[in-house]
Amino acid sequence: MGSSFGDLFRISTFGESHGGGVGVIVEGCPPRLELDLQKIQAELDRRKPGQSKISTPRKEEDQVEILSGLLNNTTLGTPIAMVVRNKDHKPGDYKEMNVAFRPSHADATYQAKYGIQARSGGGRASARETIARVAAGAIAKQLLTKAHNTEVLAWVKRIHTLEAEINAQDVSIDDVEANIVRCPNQVMAAQMVERIEAISREGDSCGGVIECVVRNAPMGLGMPVFDKLEADLAKAVMSLPASKGFEIGSGFGGTLLKGSEHNDAFLPSNDGRLRTATNNSGGIQGGITNGESIVIRVAFKPTATIRKDQQTIDADGNTTTLSAKGRHDPCVLPRAVPIVEAMVSLVLADHLLRQQGQCSLW
């Protein structure tokens, strides 16, 4: 009913921002996969709040507890249950939101749909729900690495009006993690940090674009016609809080090219893989991976909860002014990088198992 994702590699998430905790159940992970539990925690550490001066000051350790599905750190093929306890939630900081709807937030639509909602912390609409996705995605990452040495890596490409020139093939995890904004262009990263701080001082927020590359992706992933790989990738990242746009390869810029300019010419290869002179397709053609790197971009809107006064209405429809308190990110992008990686990894793990099941029997 909206809290599960995937077909064969399937996750179901639970929990609210100000509840007891957030967790996930992973079903369909193959048995005998030896997991590095430190890598799971490391991914959660990249996502956790309070990690820098440009993120929310909420302090959570986000230590993962694995409740089932492993024996000596090796998967059993049974459901893997993981939970992270909430320890630093302050419902009193949200009393303004108990009577007024935040503009462009899920408050009003959740109330309209369910007739009740957990206003404190945003409930299920809070980005804290993504803890579950990152924990599950960390397992999917390790599966992809073991099966095909596939690497999934994302970074911040744009903050507000500042856009970095980045060659997706040259970026390393060390480049991404070298600064708090997670932009591999170090010069532009410094400007991005300054921009976020300046906007935050105004009591405002900003958005931007995250780019993600998948290197060494197996050929043949994707299930035409309704489960094309780019369609499932789009659904995955567009399910994230604050996401507002998706493009792959040349994206919307490709509409400015002629067919002769946009087509990716095939090249001879000695390794049995398809090779192309360019990668405007973003590694996917006909909904199926062609062996080249997958390159996608995700647009995130400015954080809806801001300290500036905003005109809004209360639950009775009366006009009021809201100045939000609480602890919120002035820009979600630096912490969204591992979340995008997680969702892409979950899609690839699911399609890898589906490909094995349909096309690799003989």
UniProtKB/Swiss-Prot annotation:
It is an enzyme of class 4 (lyase). This reaction introduces a second double bond into the aromatic ring system. PROSITE patterns: CHORISMATE_SYNTHASE_1, CHORISMATE_SYNTHASE_2, CHORISMATE_SYNTHASE_3. CDD domains: Chorismate_synthase (cd07304). NCBIfam families: aroC (TIGR00033), PRK05382.1 (NF003793). Its EC number is 4.2.3.5. FMN binds at residues 124-126, 286, 301-305, 327. Keywords: Amino-acid biosynthesis, Aromatic amino acid biosynthesis, FAD, Flavoprotein, FMN, Lyase, NADP. InterPro entries: Chorismate_synth, Chorismate_synth_AroC_sf, Chorismate_synthase_CS. Homotetramer. Belongs to the chorismate synthase family. GO terms for cellular component: cytosol. One of its GO terms (biological process) is chorismate biosynthetic process. It comes from Prochlorococcus marinus (strain MIT 9313). This is Chorismate synthase. The gene is aroC.
